[in-house]
Curated annotation (Swiss-Prot):
Organism: Pasteurella multocida (strain Pm70)
Binding site for ATP: 60-67
Segments forming a coiled coil: 322-693, 861-1140, 1233-1289
Notes concerning its domains: The hinge domain, which separates the large intramolecular coiled coil regions, allows the homodimerization, forming a V-shaped homodimer.
One Gene Ontology term of the molecular function aspect: ATP binding
Function (record text): Plays a central role in chromosome condensation, segregation and cell cycle progression. Functions as a homodimer, which is essential for chromosome partition. Involved in negative DNA supercoiling in vivo, and by this means organize and compact chromosomes. May achieve or facilitate chromosome segregation by condensation DNA from both sides of a centrally located replisome during cell division.
Positions of region (Flexible hinge): 692-809
Subunit composition and interactions: Homodimerization via its hinge domain. Binds to DNA via its C-terminal region. Interacts, and probably forms a ternary complex, with MukE and MukF via its C-terminal region. The complex formation is stimulated by calcium or magnesium. Interacts with tubulin-related protein FtsZ.
Name of the featured protein: Chromosome partition protein MukB
Subcellular localization(s) per the UniProt record: Cytoplasm, Nucleoid
Superkingdom classification of source: Bacteria
Keywords: ATP-binding, Cell cycle, Cell division, Chromosome partition, Coiled coil, Cytoplasm, DNA condensation, DNA-binding, Nucleotide-binding
Amino acid sequence: MSEELALENLEHVETSVPHTVFSHANSAPRGKFRSLTLINWNGFFARTFDLDELVTTLSGGNGAGKSTTMAGFVTALIPDLTLLHFRNTTEAGATSGSRDKGLHGKLRPGVCYAALDTINSRNQRVIVGARLQQVAGRDKKVDIKTFSIQGLNLAENPTTIFTDVVNERQARVLTLNELKEKIEQAGAQFKQYHSITDYHAMMFDLGIIPKRLRSSSDRSKFYKLIEASLYGGISSAITRSLRDYLLPENLGVRKAFQDMESALRENRMTLEAIKVTQADRDLFKHLITETSNYVASDYMRHANERRGNIESAVRFRQDWYRARTEQHLSQQRLVELSREAAELAENEKTLEVDHQSAVDYLNLVLNALRHQEKIARYQDDVAEITARLEEQKMVVETATEQLEESQVQVEQVEQEVDQIRAQLADYQQALDAQQTRALQYQQAIAALEKAKTLCGLADLGVKNVEAYHDEFAAHAESLTEQVLELEQRMSISDAAKSQFDKAYQLVCKVAGEIPRSTAFEQAKVLLRDYPTQKVQAQQTSQLRAKLHELEQRYAQQQSAVRLLKEFNQRANVSLEDAEALEAYHAEQEALLEDVSAELSEQVEQRSTLRQKREQLSALYQDNAKKAPAWLTAQAALERLQDQSGETFADSQDVMQFMQAQLVKERELTIERDQLEQQRQQLEAQISRLSQPDGSEDARLNVLAERFGGVLLSELYDDVPIEDAPYFSALYGPARHAIVVRDLDAVKGQLAQLEECPDDLYLIEGDPTAFDDSVLSAQELAHGVVVQVSDRELRYSKFPEIPLFGRAAREQYLEALQQQRDDVTEQHAQRAFDVQKCQRLHEHFSQFVGLHLALAFQPNPEDVMAEIQQQRNEIERELNQFVTTEQQLRIQLDYAKEKMQLLNKLIPQLNLIADESLIDRVEECREQLDIAEQDELFIRQYGATLSQLEPIANTLQSDPEHYERLKADYEQAISQQKQVQQRLFALADVLQRKAHFAYEERVQTENTDLNEQLRAKLDSLQQQREVQKAQLQQKQQQFTNYNRVYIELQTSFNNKMQMLQELLQEVGELGVRADQGAEERAKQRRDELHQVLSDTRQRRHYVEKQLTLIESEAQSLNARIRKAERDYKTQRELVVAAKVSWCVVMRLSRGSDVEKRLNRREFAYLSADELRSMSDKALGALRTAVADNEYLRDSLRLSEDNRKPENKVRFFIAVYQHLRERIRQDIIKTDDPIDAIEQMEIELSRLTDELTRREQKLAISSESVANIMRKTIQREQNRIRMLNQGLQNIAFGQVKSVRLVVNIRDTHAMLLDALSGTQEEYQDLFTDQRMTFSEAIAKLYQRLNPHIDMGQRTAQTIGEELLDYRNYLDLEVEVYRGADGWLRAESGALSTGEAIGTGMSILLMVVQSWEEESRRIRGKDIVPCRLLFLDEAARLDAKSISTLFELCERLDMQLLIAAPENISPEKGTTYKLVRKIAGNQEHVHVVGLRGFGATA
């Protein structure tokens, strides 16, 4: 609440509420209501009432708040505003239409709560309640929201949960959201419910209410029970509908009946659908057949007409094209002749130019011949001068070498003479010893100094001069050896270098300037070709003669080829070789003979061809008659191949496949029968396990009913699935036993039994309280050991399929049903396969009987096509005969002209056949060119190559180290001169050594030396004179040789210059001047002159032919115009029909019906026959579609022959209409044609299958009667058990209360009729037009004609008759005083007796609900039991004590309201006193315990 309210004074309960423990049949304790909390109610701001485990009494005066407290409890229990209506027992004239139901006035403004604190069998604390709040307005509405709280500690006070303390005297009521936050903070679970159904489902699952309240009717029953308890008495609302309260609805049996009836209904509907489908099949066949005939005949008639128009158009087009071809050929010939005339004119001009060129060429050849003679003379001169020039050059070189040697010798002699003269002069000055001694001494000293200077020896002296002299002498000797070696190497290199240079110069002279490194390779090339060139040069004259001869033959061949070309052009042939010419000549010779013979043969051949054409026409007609039947056979064969998925090449394949189908059918039939047997076994097993008590033997049920007992399996029908194997093994073979109350009473009946199992077990016991503790058993891992007696043990294993426990049977039933469904599906598939095989075999049998003889014969249409082709060829041949004669005459004229040309060509055939002549001419010409080039080369360089040949090998190694060797030699000479000068200086000192000591002896020696020098000087002077004379002689010789060489060189250059000029002039002329050139040029000129005259004659002939062709072109143009006009007229017809035909083709192909319409067998019918067929089909279709507006309109539109596409649209409409009528639950295809085929296969199978299914699904009237009796018996036993708890109840004069269950007489008659064998009633259950519910309703009406059924249908009445509750009358009776057992009615009982009796009835209802709900609630949950009683003052103290004893015995809580003068001795009593303090009002509560006992 938003405002704060004063907190009421809460008095503590003076005595604690006792906790009484009750023993229950179940092991779990029963749930209890712990307290009731009211927040912000009228008079109660925050009050919690702790509830006693037995009786809680609210004591107080009028208006103390007792009814308000009970209203809060009921509101928390059933928060449904459509049901809540609080009034007291004194309220009169209260109606349900009152706006205020009593709840709005009991609340205060703001948030209000009504909550119940409970603890269930699981020791879980659960607080459930409702948040209430007044809604402003005149309607006095109340807003209710339900919630639950779980997980709170038991010590938590409910009052503190819903309020928030502000101070010591004030508190605030929490809103629902604040309450949720507070609970979540405390760690508990808060849940709000948006529907009363969810709220009650939670209360049921947790054991707060005894019954699951699924709907508003269930809530209404619960509220009426509470209301009846609250106000007391025997409630007529409950007693009138006591069956609904006490007897549970047998949903399983009812649903089983409904499922079976639904299956039967569906089965019968399917059978009706099959019958409709069979009618549809006939309709399909009729519509498809007539529509196909109607549309396909018109389709093929238009196709035939279109084909005929196209053939006519093609024929006209061929005539047109043939005329155009002739025109084209004529124009082509005109063009060719025009081109030929132009070419001839052009050739004529060209030949004139060529003829003039030939004349000019002859002049050039003559001029070239004159130049060639000069060239030959100059070439001879040049060759001669070249040879002399080479010889003279060698002479000059030899003279040059000799001159150089002489000059060297003269220079050496001059040097020696000068040295001797110098020595003589030196010695001449020292002749006088006295005069020269000092001079000699000084000279010796000077020589010594000079030696020191030259030798670079500072320590040189007289003593060591000899040693130094020896050293320098040895050095000079080694240098001399080195110089000699270098001189030797120089001489060798000088010779090699001279030969290499000479050879290199020769190579450069021939090949031009080339690198020294490639000189040898070039020399090898030149020398390799040199012998061949010499041979070629020698053959030049022979080659010229050969070339002249070949050119003459070639000119003759060209003349023959031109003649052959002219012949080919005129004869319009392309003969290239002699063989062809000879063959053509023979052909032309035979042509004249053959023409006459061929003309005579044509008559005979024409008659033969005409006879053959007639035979082919007869054969064509035979095949045309056979073609429709063959096409029909092929269509049937294709259908069989499509159906079977096989390809048949011949009739043997068909027969083999039929045999294989028979084998396959037998195998499938065996599989189908096996599956049917397996299915029957499964259904039998399912039927046995589906019995309500699980009995597999129906005789046991009869015996149990006869003995008044119950099957043991029925007693254990509710055991859990995990305990079922244990109990089944516990009883072993006795699990099929019958539990009876008295064995002695049954023993007398055993001898009279006729139908009885081999072993019948009877167990004495109370079926209502049967206990298995009499058996001594021990449970093992896989079974149970039972001590039967002291000397007998029985061990029973746990069965896989336990008899006990509905849950175990249902689980196994699910597996069996799934297995049965799988087997049923497989059986249906095998049955379908069998039907398919049978149908396929039937189709094959029909095919063998009707079409096998034709199906595998050759295609008549292919044969007809071949015949037509042969006929066309014959027609062409006959047409050719017409033109052959004219062609032969033309050939004869041509042949004569050709023979004249051939006579000219025949002698020259060998020449024409010589194809290699031109090659040989070219080859010879090339050889001559090469020979002439070689001849010129040999003339120019023959002598040079002769000189090069012996010394060419010197070019292999280039003496390129010669210069370095020369440098080394000069260096060695220089070193030798230096060493010799030093040695000479040392020798001079050594010679002057004696001057230092022996002056006289030296003088004597000098004199001798002087004489020797003079003698040597004279000898050298003589030698010098001789050398000078020789040198002068060699110089004169060299001058003469050199002059001759220069003269030869000048002459060679002049000759070569003139030769080059002549060669250049000949080259500029561009002709070859050989011996036959002049003759060839003259022959060429004469030939061109002849060709020119022939060309002029041909041109005149061609111009005449052109004039003739132009005159024939006019008649050909008129023929072309006529043919074109006929073709275009026919083509317009084809094009006009093509538009609608394209629409027809597009529709047929787009809708996939072209194959249905293109009936090839109709192509052989005439237009009248097809039109007649279409008209007949149209009449049949008008009748067939008279009831279908859409098809009737489509058919009417299709009758317009100007639009054939409408017929295709009608076919598509029929096709679509039939496709929509296909039963997809039976036929798995969209194609009506295939649907017809599948119908044939499927309908018979489905009919048999559904007939068998209906027989199995059919509900037996006897079985229904047995089920009803069994269910009634079970409920009678249950009511009997409930009566046991009411036997000792006494209220006033009422000593006992009981429930009486009786079967209505009308319904008993019905059960007897159902289980009887009266034939008069069997017509109702064998009528397949009625369901079982309708049949049982009809039977009820027959048995009870006096009962008015009202407006209810038979189906509704039958469904009510399948509910066992409608068979029973349930009444409450009391045993009262001397009256005995009386029907419990309020008028016959006092108020207290009525209240006690009504409370007893309510306890029976609650207990019945608990038993009914035990199967769907947790096994460890025992629900709370609590009833109300307002105004308990209507009962006396003894009745109240009896009520308290009943509560204690049934472990039930009771909440009563009593005035202040009522003080129960047991339970908890709350004293309620309403107090008013100022403007505030509250109820003062004091709790007491049993104060009456202490008074």
